[in-house]
């Protein structure tokens, strides 16, 4: 079972923790990790915009986002991250420590880490579905969620382009899973990395053959969420497609569009 353990990483992880200090890593280290993951996931999609070969994988072929709108979006996202997300991490630091989150906790086994990631995706998706659906009603949409829909044809960095209150509301769903299943910072950072890739990818505007959408059943991905931005309603879940199917909120023409695309590919 040693092969299913992360013990081989522990010495390097604990040296890293000793060097920077647990106090720094829990708050500021997590923020830095967030920034590295977020922009690290976005940059490949940004590069793809400059390579003609990838143009055929764009979902909304007729819509372009100019540099002015992308720059404005990037500035607003960074301001939200620095002025909202970082203070949130600092404010909740005592609560995080109170529940026992530690950078020095033993690392989980690989199976338990995978279980935590899958469970966190399911929990976050369920929370996001209902919170997101609620944000499409009345004053919640008019004064809060409408900001996120400024871009009908999204690109990766728009994932966190949102009203500050929405950032707080939807951010809660991201941390529930890892806090329920683990108390170690390593797992939280791994989850943060995969979750940020998921949200950046589903806002990327690209449907590549190697995208999770085409590999994992019930995975929504960019085509699923891009449709939501295009028509402003339906397809509310963040990661999977089954909740929208169960509760009857799948986009009316989404699946007919997917079926048509599959037929065109087979011809």
Swiss-Prot record:
Top-level division of the source organism's lineage: Eukaryota
Motif (Histidine box-1): 132-136
One GO molecular-function entry: iron ion binding
Keyword terms, alphabetized: Endoplasmic reticulum, Iron, Lipid biosynthesis, Lipid metabolism, Membrane, NAD, Oxidoreductase, Steroid biosynthesis, Steroid metabolism, Sterol biosynthesis, Sterol metabolism, Transmembrane, Transmembrane helix
Presence of keyword Nucleus: no
Transmembrane residue ranges: 31-51, 72-92, 110-130
Motif Histidine box-2 boundaries: 145-149
Enzyme's top EC category: oxidoreductase
GO biological process: sterol biosynthetic process
Residues covered by the Fatty acid hydroxylase domain: 119-249
Pathway in which the depicted protein is active: Steroid biosynthesis; zymosterol biosynthesis; zymosterol from lanosterol: step 3/6
Classification via Pfam families: FA_hydroxylase (PF04116)
Reaction equation(s) it catalyzes: 4,4-dimethyl-5alpha-cholest-7-en-3beta-ol + 6 Fe(II)-[cytochrome b5] + 3 O2 + 5 H(+) = 4alpha-carboxy-4beta-methyl-5alpha-cholest-7-ene-3beta-ol + 6 Fe(III)-[cytochrome b5] + 4 H2O
Membrane topology field: Multi-pass membrane protein
GO annotation, cellular component aspect: endoplasmic reticulum membrane
Cofactor or coenzyme needed: Fe cation
Cellular compartment(s): Endoplasmic reticulum membrane
EC number of this enzyme: 1.14.18.9
Motif (Histidine box-3): 224-230
The family this protein is said to belong to: Belongs to the sterol desaturase family.
Domain notes per entry: The histidine box domains may contain the active site and/or be involved in metal ion binding.
Name of the protein described by the UniProt record: Putative methylsterol monooxygenase DDB_G0270946
